[in-house]
Each structure stands twice: as structure tokens, then as C-alpha cells.
Amino acid sequence: MDIDDIKHNRRVVSNISSLLDNDILCDVIITIGDGEEIKAHKTILAAGSKYFRTLFTTPMIIRDLVTRVNLQMFDKDAVKNIVQYLYNRHISSMNVIDVLKCADYLLIDDLVTDCESYVKDYTNHDTCIYIYHRLYEMSHIPIVKYVKRMVMRNIPTLITTDAFKNAVFEILLDIISTNDGEYVYREGYKVTILLKWLDYNYITEEQLLCILSCIDIQNLDKKSRLLLYSNTTINMYSSCVKFLLDNKQNRNIIPRQLCLVYHDTNYNISNPCILVYNINTMEYNTIYTIHNNIINYSSAVVDNEIIIAGGYNFNNISLNKVYKINIEHRTCVELPPMIKNRCHFSLAVIDDMIYAIGGQNGTIVERSVECYTMGDDTWKMLPDMPDAISSYGMCVFDQYIYIIGGRTEHVKYIPVQHMNEIVDINEHSSDKVIRYDTVNNIWEKLPNLCSGTIRPSVVSHKDDIYVVCDIKDDEINGFKTCIFRYNTKDNYKGWELITTIDSKLTVLHTILHDDAITILHWYESCMIQDKFNIDTYKWTNICYQRSNSYIVHDTLPIY
């Protein structure tokens, strides 16, 4: 006699289910929730759960006619769903995370796998930190590791979300203390994550000490140390303040200095060189040369490693390659290339993110913006600038990237020997000032400068932005170096001209050093170092000496 297997299976399931529904031969009572009870059959539960199988076959339990099991620590609807699942009934996916937790406890492997698959399909950028919040204690199951990796990869944007603001301390600790080589954050960015969380959460003294111990305080950059010292929550706890003071900054690893990215005009090729310049001793030496001839690239510092991107050479009018140079070990590796070819542009760095903005792409001036998070495989595009611009001034202040002046039309190839020569700054120059909000991904227009300027130097100090630029003066048939100041707390006040002096050169390199603007420039093979005190408005000539054949392209602060 042939029997329809499907019909037979359905009949068996129906018969077993009717025993459950009618409370026939039930020999186990499960207590859930606020004392509610579920009756079931040991044989059915043991067949689907290793936990129940082990429990019901122990010598002390096996003699019981009716066994009681307490599962009140789990969501009662999740327990009901699991019992239905063990009786081969359809269950709801509404509380899949609660079901996953209970199924993992009861060692129901098939159900755990099904729940993991559902959670993986549901997990994305917007939900990952919420799901990790619910599952972080279950680090032994694969889906939790998957969700954690997604959180770690997207933390630069997640720290602004409500899910992060509401995260428990254990998640914060997990993020900052991770030893996963792919997602270990630089020390300064750990401070950013911690302070953002502290803005919305209470933390005990013991917890805060635990977090601080995960940060290499000695090798923090100056800005991050000041942020820790000035934080209200940290200053509430004397032991935390003492911990910071006892771990004074280690100045011996990387001395206070500048890295100058320069070219040597004694050679026809244009290989970028990294030269370390000590501001205090005014001594310098070359530490690395990139074995690619490029000029008019952009450079930046990320966690005391130098990034060089884009530029052009004799064969290519623009490039998209990106290099990372380790200063301490004097090594160079190639990072993922930018999406767009760029030259005459700038790199902005906020935490672990690098922003490539505008610039020139062949004969086109770009409006495009792209960003790269250290450790990622690719760059991604961001909202365009309001106008296409290259050869502008740039600085980072809080969450904003400020763009000042620049050139609105493309410029032809300039030999490296002429990079520091005076250019006609009235030719297609811009007086516009804009800033990019990296949190909300929007561009904002600010008050314009009084005149167009190309390649101005920009630095920030306290709440002010300073622009050092050369303005053409027809009365003297030459140029004047002007310093403008803009207060970021008063967007309507505009730019204030605070000083002017005669200048011989339009290419200036500035750095804020000891509450003064230090200006480095090169003229006729001489290096000139001037200092402007922003409190007294006084100029001081520090150095005037031979600089061999160096043409400096950029200055990068190293602390």
C-alpha cells in the first residue's frame, strides 16, 4: 500500500499538536513571564533541543512524572514561539532577536541558524548598532561577529545617531577596546567616540577609568589630550584626572616638528620628498622620497602618517593614486585610488576620514567631493560643492571643512621649478568662502573675502579662522601679505583684516605654533621663517638661510 508521505507527515504533526492543545499526556510545565505556564511533552521538546534532552535524561529528573522548567528570564512570547516551533508549527518573525537568544540557550541549532539568516538580511547601516545593542553579549555566535564588523566599519557616521547615543557602556567599551587589526581606531579617534557618548550618558568612575585605560594617553595628539582634560564628566572624578596627569604625553617618540613635502629642483624629475623640519632648532633632513614623479598633489597627516594623493606628471594631466608614508619606519604603501583624478586640490582629515575636495581633473575644474575611511577598500562620493574650485585654502575646525578662495578655471601645466613663483591672483580667482558640515553632509555659504585669492594658507585657533594670503596692490605694483580673521561663533560678522606687510612671494606655508602663526616661504633658494603673534599683532623674523634647491609644496604638523 502506497502512502502519501506529505499527507502522513501532516497527520502526525496534527495528532501531536492536538495532544498539546488538549493538554493530553503533557509531562512538562514551563513557567514563563509573570508566572504563566505552558504545558508540553518531554519527548517532543527533547527531540528538538539538546538542552531539554540533557535535562530530561538526568537521573534526578527522569523519575519525575511531571517536570517543571523555569524560563522566566526570556521573553514569554519568544518561549511560546519556540514551543510552537518544536511542534513543527509556523512561528512569527516579529521577535526574532528574543527567539534567537532563547533558542541559543536551549541549544536548538536549526532555529538559531534560521534566526541568524533573518537577522543578517535585516542588518544594514541604519539598524546595525541597534541589533548589536541587543546581541552583543552573544559573541559566540557568528551573526554577532557579522553585526559587530558592520558597526566598526561604519562608526564614523554611527556616532551621530540616536542608537549610538543610547548604547550601553559595554558596547562603548567593546568598540574602543577592540583588538581586531582591521578596525583598531587611532587613539585620537577613540577620544572622539568616548566624548560623543559621554555627551548623552552617565558613567561611573570605575567605568570611565576602564575606558581611559584602553586609550594610549601618552601618544595622544595635543588636541585630543586637551579635549580629555577639559571634559566635564572626566573632571568629576579625581582618579580619572590623576590617571591623565600620570600618563603625560610622550614627546620622545615624535618630536614637535614639521614635515615638509618638497621637490629638489637640481633634478629634472619631480619626485616628492619628505623633509623633517624642527621648528625650534631650524634644522631639517630628508627622510623619504616617493619613487613617482608627480607635482601639484595634495598631502595630509593621519595619525602621524603622511598621505599623498593625486597630482600630475609629464605623461598624465591628472592622477588618482594615493600613498601612505610611515614617518617612523620610513616606508611607503599604496592605498586605494581616488574615484576622480585630481590635482591642485586639498585633503581634509577628520578623525579617520580623509576628504578629497574639488581640484583640477585634466582641463576640468571639479565640484566633486569624495571621502575615504582608513582601512576601507574604496572611496565614496559625497555631495558636490556649490561651485567648481581648485587651488583654494582649506582648514578643518570641529565638524566643518572650510574652503577659502581658489581658482575657478583650469591652469596649464606648471614646471616644478616655477611652483613658488608669483602668479596673477586676479586671473579667475575666487573670493568665496564655504564650509562642509561632515555630520549632516551639507554645504554652507559664509561671508566672502574682500578680494579673490589663490592658494591662501588657513589655520584655526580657538574659535577663529585665520587666512594668510597675498593680495595684489596696484599702488606699490606688487603684493602685500594679509592676515584675515573670522570668528566661527558669529557667522554674520564677516572677515576682519588684522595686518598687512609687503611680500615677495605668493606661495606661503603656515602653521599655528605656540599661539603664533609661523609662516614659512622660499625665495631665491632662501628659506624665510616669520612669526606673527595673534595676541600682540607683532611680526618676528626668525630665520633667513640658504635652503639649497628645495621647492616646498606643503607643510604638515607632527606632534
UniProtKB/Swiss-Prot annotation:
Residues 26-95 form the BTB domain. It comes from the Viruses. PROSITE patterns: BTB. InterPro entries: BACK (IPR011705), BTB/POZ_dom (IPR000210), Kelch-typ_b-propeller (IPR015915), Kelch_1 (IPR006652), SKP1/BTB/POZ_sf (IPR011333). It is found in: Host cytoplasm. GO terms for cellular component: host cell cytoplasm. Interacts (via BTB domain) with host CUL3. Keywords: Host cytoplasm, Host-virus interaction, Kelch repeat, Modulation of host E3 ubiquitin ligases by virus, Modulation of host ubiquitin pathway by virus, Repeat, Ubl conjugation pathway. GO terms for biological process: symbiont-mediated perturbation of host ubiquitin-like protein modification. The keyword Transferase does not apply. Disulfide bonds: none annotated. Gene3D superfamilies: Kelch-type beta propeller, Potassium Channel Kv1.1, Chain A. Kelch repeats lie at residues 305-352, 353-399, 401-463. Pfam families: BACK, BTB, Kelch_KLHDC2_KLHL20_DRC7. This is Kelch repeat and BTB domain-containing protein 2. The gene is KBTB2. Probable substrate-specific adapter of CUL3-containing E3 ubiquitin-protein ligases which mediate the ubiquitination and subsequent proteasomal degradation of host target proteins. The keyword GTP-binding does not apply. The BTB domain is responsible for the interaction with CUL3 while the Kelch repeat domains supposely serve to recruit the cellular substrates.
